[in-house]
UniProtKB/Swiss-Prot annotation:
This is Acetyl-coenzyme A carboxylase carboxyl transferase subunit alpha. It catalyses: N(6)-carboxybiotinyl-L-lysyl-[protein] + acetyl-CoA = N(6)-biotinyl-L-lysyl-[protein] + malonyl-CoA. Coiled coil: none annotated. GO terms for biological process: fatty acid biosynthetic process; malonyl-CoA biosynthetic process. It holds the Pfam family ACCA. It comes from Parvibaculum lavamentivorans (strain DS-1 / DSM 13023 / NCIMB 13966). It is found in: Cytoplasm. The gene is accA. It is an enzyme of class 2 (transferase).
Length: 319
């Protein structure tokens, strides 16, 4: 059963009517309603296209959080052959909110690292809804260092509402872990491609997303804080989330204009969750293209290009 968002109610009504008519036709073949079904399907498709062509920032937040949106393990399952997960930070323990491992991607060895939110209740609990603890970032550091040692490129997929803010995270220095993970990204001597596939919130996302090339799916979001958090801090109210989402310029389109990201990957009409396999394949194509563009650079050039890219942020309008 498809999950509809609040702003999709008119679409849900039309698609629901189409399903009702199709069931009626199955129950009574003598009923001729083919033309009516076709008209409703066209109307629903047009409404879906018009709706997604003019989404507000807050509506994009809702799409980025859609429960059926493909997650890290969905991408790994369809893009990576012989994936071997690697667990533990070798300091404290294992954190399932960040998953990483080696595999074959389009004929080459690649280290894949990313946030996993989980797709059902059991999975969400296991992966802590994609909110990583310190050991998750320290595991990412370990895997990136391993990839560098063997000259293997790294691909990271960010999808988190933020690092886990619990007491145990603070006791084990989550801020320090994120800072060191960010530094490891910036100093890595192999190509690093980062893709924001859903939510990219705060240091929790940045800690694994400082790539040579940073890509975002069309309806994903990327920001230092969630709209709810910004509303609470700036307006002392939970009623200003829509205003916060607009003011912070958290959409892929805004961030591309500002030079924060390098590329926006178009999503199927209706979002990545409607055509999961298509979205995953096209994301894989983009990753392969970006890796090919970096394969001739030596380690020093890879580091220099990446650092210059991030140091240049914020200079737009000042030169």
């Amino acid at each position: 059963m498809h999950t509809y968002l609040d702003f999709e109610k008119p679409i849900a009504e039309l698609e629901g009517k189409v399903q009702e008519l199709k069931l009626l036709a199955q129950e009574d073949p003598s009923v001729s309603i083919g033309d009516e079904v076709s008209k409703l399907e066209q109307k629903a498709a047009q409404l879906l296209q018009e709706t997604y062509a003019s989404l507000t920032p807050w509506q994009k937040v809702q799409v980025a959080r859609h429960p059926a949106r493909p997650h890290f393990l969905d991408y790994v399952e369809r893009l990576v052959e012989d994936f071997t997960p690697l667990a533990g930070d070798r300091l404290y323990g294992e954190d399932s909110a960040i998953v990483g491992g080696l595999g074959r991607f389009r004929g080459r060895s690649v280290m894949f690292i990313g946030h996993e939110k989980g797709s059902d209740t059991q999975g969400r609990i296991k992966h802590n809804f994609g909110m990583a603890r310190p050991e998750g970032y320290r595991k990412a550091i370990r895997l990136m260092t391993l990839a560098e040692r063997f000259g293997i490129p790294v691909v990271t997929l960010a999808d988190t509402s933020g690092a886990y803010p619990g007491m145990e995270s603070e006791e084990r220095s989550v801020a320090e872990a994120i800072a060191r993970s960010t530094d490891r990204c910036l100093s890595l001597g192999v190509p690093l491609i980062s893709v924001v596939i859903g939510e990219g919130m705060s240091g929790g996302a940045i800690g694994i997303a400082c790539g040579n090339r940073v890509l975002m799916l069309e309806h994903s979001i990327y920001s230092v804080i969630s709209p709810e958090g910004a509303s609470s801090i700036l307006w002392r109210s939970s009623d200003k989330t829509k205003d916060a989402a607009t003011a912070m310029k958290i959409t892929a389109q805004h961030l591309h204009e500002l030079g924060v990201i390098d590329r926006v990957l178009p999503e199927p009409v209706g979002g990545a969750h409607r055509e999961r396999n298509q979205m995953i394949k096209e994301t894989g194509d983009a990753i392969a293209e970006e890796l090919k563009g970096l394969e001739k650079l030596d380690a020093d050039s890879i580091r220099r290009v990446r650092r210059e890219k991030f140091l240049a942020m914020g200079r737009i309008g000042f030169s």
